[in-house]
């Protein structure tokens, strides 16, 4: 209903059986972006944990994935890039810089870790890349662990979209 009210001309609903990841992979060649609902673990609402089905999809596809939270939708007023300076995080920043999806929104590049000259340089490099693409960019470097620091940061940012790479550590 919201999509139609927003002017979307063509909607396609399908009922599918089988594994979510298999269905998403089937649609991937024709998709530019996937939007999935999230089921956060109630046991730790201050941490970022995704439902295992959503996590499997994110690991399997090569397209960007938006994970929608529960509750009232608010259009993003800014975006926060969770940035660790890795090659993958750098590719994420490059993808954002090329994408029209976030154009016009201010950015915050957030790094969680030790306050070192190398970390400051990595943040500056990410900021410069996004600024060259026309974004207004701030940076922040915070001590702690990303799983605790990022949710707290997002609460201070109002209606913000979190952009992050997938953590490649295998859950055991």
Question: What is each model feature region?
Answer:
Residues 1-2, 6, 13-14:
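N-terminal positively charged helical leader segments and presequences
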Residues 7-10, 30, 75, 103, ...:
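Short loop/turn motifs at secondary-structure junctions
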Residues 10-14, 43-46, 85, 139-142:
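Short, flexible loop segments at the rims of nucleotide/cofactor-binding pockets, characterized by
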Residues 13, 19-72, 154-172:
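Gly/Ser-rich helix-loop-strand patches that form or flank binding pockets
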Residues 21-22, 89-90, 147-148:
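Short, well-ordered alpha-helical microsegments
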Residues 47-63, 69-133:
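Short acidic/Ser/Thr-enriched loop-to-helix initiation segments
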Residues 105-170:
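Glycine/small-residue-rich hydrophobic helix-like segments
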